[in-house]
Amino acid sequence: MLDILLFVHITISILLIIVILMQRSGSGGISGISGDNNMGVVSAKTVGNFLSKSTIILTTLFLINAIILANLSSKKKSNLVSKINEIEENQTDNSLPIAK
């Protein structure tokens, strides 16, 4: 479960970087690479709205996934600590001298 969520987190991160870089900035951003200012059927405002909404959705998914990953990893760590403590208690109770 943790591995799947980690893969999803990395994928969301990469998509978020791509969407942010595609947004139009003062210098044009990566969206101006084509050099064609006439976008045909799709207007620049429509593309800007789509990229803005995509950024908001991906950011929300990123934050939710980060919280879930943090919660799961803290539970996993506490389980590991309790198991180590149990093993140490069992070893001290059942320890016998090696040689007499």
From Swiss-Prot:
The keyword Transmembrane applies. Involved in protein export. Participates in an early event of protein translocation. The chain crosses the membrane at residues 1-21, 54-74. GO terms for molecular function: protein-transporting ATPase activity. Keywords: Cell membrane, Membrane, Protein transport, Translocation, Transmembrane, Transmembrane helix, Transport. It comes from the Bacteria. Its main location: membrane. It is found in: Cell membrane. GO terms for cellular component: plasma membrane. Belongs to the SecG family. GO terms for biological process: intracellular protein transmembrane transport; protein secretion; protein transport by the Sec complex. It is a multi-pass membrane protein. The gene is secG. It comes from Rickettsia typhi (strain ATCC VR-144 / Wilmington). InterPro entries: SecG. This is Protein-export membrane protein SecG.
